[in-house]
Amino acid sequence: ISSAASDVYKRQAKNQLDDFTHTCFMVTPYEEYTAVCEKLNELTPGDHEKRSALFNSGAEAVENAVKIARVHTGRQAVVAFDHAYHGRTNLTMALTAKNMPYKQGFGPFAGDVYRMPMAYPYRWVGNADTITDDAFEAFTSAVHAQIGEQNVAAVIIEPIQGEGGFIVPPAGWLKKVADWCRENGIVFIADEVQSGFCRTGDWFACDAEGVVPVSYTHLTLPTIC
């Protein structure tokens, strides 16, 4: 990577190596950690108060987002979607929809994880003109029947699913799900580890839909608001 980088990037990397301290922030706080968190708070959508924390991997970020959602709501159930990929730890494998090569032989997995159908325009068997409303109705009806809204701590979704096949949900569906979560006191977690930081043209894939998640995970860093 460094051989292909410009001299500017190389100088910045060297400066970081001169100053970097890889320690647990809770034991030995350091300025660079705080600076990164402040920048994340500035960049993520919404003008509300935000708090950021840095972790070692995307899976660890997702695990912490789920833990915080459970403590915050006092609920346990977590909803994920078909075709999802969220990591390879025990909980994130439970959230991940693909058995091979991620999950085979590694169970049993964490409980209280429920999977719902994804709004997938290319594979949708219903009316393509009404997929946004129909897929949202299918989602809310399934949650109500199988779990109960009052038991759901979090709904976690990749705004654009990566490992599932670069699946872009229909316009408006993501916002409907996010608004429904707020109405029911559920934490809406956007996992943008693969779609965040300008990979879609916007800083975050949620920006295109005007969605402000309660919790973000991105580039192996979660921002919890």
Question: Each predicted region: which residue ranges?
Answer:
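Single conserved hydrophobic/aromatic residue that forms the stacking wall/gate
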Residues: 1-5, 9, 218-225
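Glycine-rich phosphate-binding segment of PLP-dependent enzymes
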Residues: 3-28, 35-53
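Conserved active-site segment immediately N-terminal to the catalytic lysine
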Residues: 205-219
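Short, small-residue-enriched loops and turns at beta-alpha junctions
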Residues: 122, 162-164, 196-197
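Active-site nucleophile and cofactor-binding loops and adjacent substrate-binding regions
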Residues: 25-32, 52-59, 82-83, 194, ...
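PLP-dependent aspartate aminotransferase-fold enzymes
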Residues: 38-154
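Catalytic PLP-binding core of fold-type I/II PLP enzymes
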Residues: 167-201
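Short acidic, glycine-rich surface-loop motifs adjacent to enzyme active sites
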Residues: 150-165
